[in-house]
Amino acid sequence: MTDYKATLNLPDTAFPMKAGLPQREPQTLQRWDSIGLYQKLREIGKDRPKFVLHDGPPYANGNIHIGHAVNKILKDMILRSKTLAGFDAPYVPGWDCHGLPIEHKVEVTHGKNLSADRTRELCRAYASEQIEGQKSEFIRLGVLGDWSNPYLTMNFANEAGEIRALAEMVKGGFVFKGLKPVNWCFDCGSALAEAEVEYQDKKSSTIDVAFPIADEAKLAAAFGVPSLGKPASIVIWTTTPWTIPANQALNVHPEFEYALVDVGDKLLVLAAELVESCLARYKLEGTVIATTTGQALELINFRHPFYDRLSPVYLADYVELGAGTGIVHCSPAYGVDDFTICKQYGLSNDDIISPVQSNGVYVESLEFFGGQFIFKANQNIIDKLVEVGSLMDTETISHSYMHCWRHKSPLIYRATAQWFVGMDKQPESGETLRKRAVKAIEDTEFVPAWGQARLHSMIANRPDWCISRQRNWGVPIPFFLHKESGDLHPRTVELMEEVAQRVEKEGIEAWFKLDASELLGDEAGKYDKISDTLDVWFDSGTTHWHVLRGSHPMGHESGPRADLYLEGSDQHRGWFHSSLLTGCMLDDHAPYRELLTHGFVVDENGRKMSKSLNNVVAPQKVNDSLGADIMRLWVSATDYSGEMAVSDQILQRSADAYRRIRNTARFLLSNLTGFNPATDILPAEEMLALDRWAVDRTLLLQRELLEHYGEYRFWNVYSKIHNFCVQELGGFYLDIIKDRQYTTAANSTARRSCQTALFHISEALVRWIAPILAFTADELWQFLPGERNESVMLNTWYDGLTEMPADFDMDRAYWERIMAVKTSVNKEMENLRAAKAIGGNLQAEVTLYAEESLVADLSKLSNELRFVLITSTASVAPLASAPADAVVTEVAGLKLKVLKSSHAKCARCWHHREDVGVNPEHPEICGRCVDNISGAGEVRHYA
């Protein structure tokens, strides 16, 4: 038997079937580094329009987790796609370096007795070490960036830039010193930003407390009774017994109805609507003897239960009837609403009673409870109320309560002297910050769109921004306050610039070691040099001003503006929020044109990642087991607008999809062997109809993909590329062209036409996958035929695809119909193979019985219809002639009948043909194969 293998154009490529990503990807990273890929991208991008994505800096602490990986991969996919779209899209990664978590780590390692200078020194060293670890992990994900020159908030230039930004805000009239209740953590010993507060369930003691009347005549008059006749008290309800020592007022709603209730030995004032529930709680019976409005009770004095001072009634709209008594006890030092109401009634900062120290312990001078930790004092306060006869009831409830995000410990509101940015404070010029921010939100694009309403509601309802902290490791607030008046030095802005210049050379240490006399001279004795530091959200929130400024030629004329900020959905109250406020203060607009938000990563059951649940997916392990490209493919395939589910099983599905894409690419490459694009490529008009359709279909898909890339809809990109590989290519085109590729003459038009199409498809495909499968695209690029530069990323989207003419006979709709027919034939073949009626498709002879228009379509392919259907013979007949046993298909007007061929099998092409053995020199092959080996070669027109 003759071996005809040498006469075939068998597929051949060195592109490996097995990806070996965990081993191959690090080698690719080394290659990118050795060729200076990022620098080359900047060189070729000099004259391109710029696209700037400003990196939200991750915190320099610990290894990266799956959420970090998602964030960095999304950014990289966007910037790679923008580069391929013809933009100069640099990526400067950043790190957030100051703040409590790092200071806490240093304290845990080295103890709490460090000097402030030593603490800062160790914090800087720790942050540097953490950055190097995270940097290598980000690079391993295939993220292209200026990793040699990242921006760090602890860089001296950035620390100085932050001080200059603050100086601009002081100059603009946005900053003020105030005594206000702020979120306070005893473990941190500092105020917390809104973004550092989380809510957990907490058990608390509730108490109903009676405050005895001081102005008996006024209370009687308010209720319209001649006299009280017996002791009377107003009753409050609270979940924070520890605030009772700081009580300074009692709040009622001006429009609610309040009742004077006789319970036998005394009178109680309660909200009329709550009398029944309150008396049941107190196990008392009583009679309502009079009612009045809250308005009538204003400024009536009651007595504190155990201190010799008065508690007047103030009106407050925030009082509710959902629980309690309808009267709220008011401690202005420990509640935002309480503070606001007391200020409205004329209490000065000096009037406000604030007995709780920064560590949560009452001052020693507080009568009865001095030196006690507030939460431990709750029971002692309850006991005192029992002793004085003021406790009406106590219960234990579980409720949602604010906790420190770092220590998980309960927080309190605590009035302290802090520095604030005023949301509604009138600046030196222009609108208030709140109005500016609301307008800026309206001018910003949001992906997904719901982010706009979320950020808007946060800005509309947020309090003034407390920007000061009482920590060591942070950018200083370099203010000098007059010792007597407490006012800022009149040359504050000028002095801040002098400090910034020193910080630029020596870092924040320059301020802390500064002697006031160096800047103030003889005035130094009159001023206090403050030691507060800036909120870390101010650090990252001002990076647009001192990192991004000047880097974007398309920026707003009044300041820098990034094209895109991209972070997790928690950053609506974090970086998006602080950046918006600083941008509106400094430049009167948001520092971004568009905000993109991605969801949190959860497991396949929607649960958060947790060591206790054993469901943590670590990116480092994925890199080592499957490869970063598999993780990148999972990110692209997942709709990031909601929660993003991941697990080993989900990643395995991504690996399966990856193999299908890789195998498609390998098939394309293996059939381009011997193809030189410089000499072998055919113009579109010389290509076979099916090949022209394949290139046209690729062009249509590319248009869709570019639109999806432009809208950051990567899951659409992934699904369409995957479907193209599996369906149009793997399930149709590539299956059909195998016979032509392998059996026709190597340099025949039939084969070169097909190779031309495969080349165009490959050139497009390698670019399509480059933003997602960064490593695989780079590998594929090295194996494509023809001269080419060092990386797919040094190119733009492929422009060599051609569209079929509008009047082309075998147009898009034609091939859609042919595909449907082929699908029906394939289904019947599968049934026959399962029944063992035939061994394979090429054993089949198929007759298609079709209605008139379909007969015309099928007949256009003439004797090449069998190559499209991949059968040994294929014939077409009118539908009316279909025998009774013809199979009805899903295609309207089509039946078919398949018979097993009785003809011999060609040893070369494996078709069963009548003319096998006709040529005595080649008794084992068909006439077509004889012609392809020793004759002029077969001529194909369509497929």
From Swiss-Prot:
Q: Which GO terms describe its molecular function?
A: aminoacyl-tRNA deacylase activity; ATP binding; isoleucine-tRNA ligase activity; tRNA binding; zinc ion binding
Q: Which SUPFAM superfamilies match?
A: Anticodon-binding domain of a subclass of class I aminoacyl-tRNA synthetases, Nucleotidylyl transferase, ValRS/IleRS/LeuRS editing domain
**What CDD domains is this protein classified in?**
Anticodon_Ia_Ile_BEm (cd07960)
Q: Where does Zn(2+) bind?
A: 906, 909, 926, 929
Q: Which superkingdom heads the taxonomic lineage of this protein's source?
A: Bacteria
Enumerate the catalysed reactions: tRNA(Ile) + L-isoleucine + ATP = L-isoleucyl-tRNA(Ile) + AMP + diphosphate
Query: Its Enzyme Commission number?
Result: 6.1.1.5
Q: What class of enzyme is it?
A: ligase
Required cofactor names: Zn(2+)
Mention any one GO cellular component term assigned to this protein in its UniProt record. Answer: cytosol
Q: What is known of its domains?
A: IleRS has two distinct active sites: one for aminoacylation and one for editing. The misactivated valine is translocated from the active site to the editing site, which sterically excludes the correctly activated isoleucine. The single editing site contains two valyl binding pockets, one specific for each substrate (Val-AMP or Val-tRNA(Ile)).
This protein is called: Isoleucine--tRNA ligase
Q: Which organism was this protein described from?
A: Pseudomonas syringae pv. syringae (strain B728a)
